[in-house]
Each structure stands twice: as structure tokens, then as C-alpha cells.
């Protein structure tokens, strides 16, 4: 009776030990800096990074022609998402990546960095409520990984009230961005 159980694979790995103070503080700081709602989002980013680093370690030991092809493919994927910004990367560059490199490529972070929102939390709210479009298509997932090609195409959605230049909240956002650029220029 009832529907069959839906089996799914977890997209993250939890920490081995739940109560390590340094890890908890580091995760809390990442959640605050990037406007994440749960530590699970940090764990997902760590799992993505772990996957790339594991592949790089395997390719360092693999000296065959196939290993070289796979290394080039890994570099292309990381460059496509803007995680690896170096022109001629090596596998050591992949091993030196951090969780912040992954979190910087989330749509939520890029909306905040582009000045479409005042805070990372507001960026998340705008995305979830359907006010942000990527390449003309509304994206409602704050964890959406933005490619380098799509980065310039992030904007307010066509049907969003934020698309109007006279929207009062948008005026606050633009004013805040102008203040930040002035303080950076004076420094």
C-alpha cells in the first residue's frame, strides 16, 4: 500500500565529528558571509570541492595519455564555472582551491556582488521570489552555479517590479552600491 520509497543519493557528506569548535565557527562565518541558511549548504560546497580535489589527486598519479585528457577536461569544467581563473592551470592549482572559491560562483553571491541586492540574504530572497533572471530565464535556486558566460547576463526578471528604475527598494540598493564605490575609491 502506498507509494514505493523514493531512493535518492545525498549530495553532501556530513562532518565526521559533530562537535569540533573550530569547524563550527568556520562554517558559521561562511554562512554569515555568503548568506547561507543551513550548514548543509556549506557541506554541499565542500563535497563539490572534495570531488574535484579527489579527481586531481588521481590524475597526478595517472601519467597516461588518458590521464592528460581527463586533466584538460577537468580544467575546462573549472574554467567554465569560473572556479579556476588561471590561464595555464596545473593539477596543483586544483588542489589549492578552497570552499570559498565554490561559494563565490553561486547565483546568490553573484547577485550580491553585482549590486542587485543590498545583502546576501536579500539576494537569496530576490532569487527565491523569482525576481532574478539569468540569460532571460528566471532562476529560483540560490545555489545555482553560474558559468562565466552567464555571469554578465544576470539581471532582474522582466516581470519583476524591481525591473522598474523607480522602484523604491532599487533606489536604496543603487544608493548603497554608490556609497561603497566611493569609500573604495577614497582608500
From Swiss-Prot:
Q: Which domain of life is it from?
A: Archaea
Can you supply a Gene Ontology BP term from the record?
Answer: translation
The record ties this protein, via Pfam families, to: Ribosomal_S4, S4
* Disulphides: none
Instruction: Cite the entry's keywords alphabetically.
Output: Ribonucleoprotein, Ribosomal protein, RNA-binding, rRNA-binding
GO molecular function terms attached to this record: rRNA binding; structural constituent of ribosome
Domain S4 RNA-binding: where? 105-174
Its GO CC terms are: small ribosomal subunit
Read off the SUPFAM superfamilies from this record: Alpha-L RNA-binding motif
Q: How does it assemble?
A: Part of the 30S ribosomal subunit. Contacts protein S5. The interaction surface between S4 and S5 is involved in control of translational fidelity.
**Stated role:** One of the primary rRNA binding proteins, it binds directly to 16S rRNA where it nucleates assembly of the body of the 30S subunit. With S5 and S12 plays an important role in translational accuracy.
Q: Which family does it belong to?
A: Belongs to the universal ribosomal protein uS4 family.
- Which named protein is this? Small ribosomal subunit protein uS4
- State the organism of origin: Methanocaldococcus jannaschii (strain ATCC 43067 / DSM 2661 / JAL-1 / JCM 10045 / NBRC 100440)
Taxonomic lineage is: Archaea, Methanobacteriati, Methanobacteriota, Methanomada group, Methanococci
Amino acid at each position: 500500500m502506498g507509494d514505493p520509497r523514493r531512493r535518492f543519493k545525498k549530495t553532501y557528506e556530513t562532518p565526521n565529528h559533530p562537535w569540533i569548535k573550530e569547524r563550527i565557527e568556520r562554517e558559521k562565518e561562511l554562512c554569515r558571509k555568503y548568506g547561507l541558511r543551513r550548514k548543509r549548504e556549506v557541506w554541499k560546497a565542500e563535497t563539490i570541492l572534495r570531488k574535484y580535489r579527489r579527481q586531481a589527486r588521481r590524475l597526478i598519479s595517472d601519467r597516461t595519455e588518458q590521464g592528460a585528457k581527463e586533466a584538460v577536461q577537468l580544467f575546462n569544467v573549472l574554467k567554465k564555472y569560473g572556479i579556476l581563473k588561471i590561464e595555464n592551470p596545473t593539477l596543483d592549482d586544483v588542489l589549492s582551491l578552497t570552499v570559498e572559491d565554490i561559494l563565490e560562483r553561486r547565483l546568490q553571491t553573484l547577485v550580491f556582488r553585482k549590486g542587485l541586492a543590498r545583502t546576501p540574504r536579500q539576494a537569496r530572497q530576490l532569487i527565491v521570489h523569482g525576481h532574478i533572471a539569468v540569460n532571460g530565464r528566471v532562476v529560483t535556486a540560490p545555489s545555482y552555479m553560474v558559468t562565466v558566460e552567464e555571469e554578465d547576463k544576470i539581471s532582474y526578471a522582466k516581470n519583476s517590479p524591481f525591473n522598474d528604475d523607480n522602484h523604491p527598494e532599487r533606489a536604496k540598493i543603487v544608493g548603497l552600491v554608490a556609497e561603497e564605490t566611493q569609500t573604495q575609491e577614497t582608500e
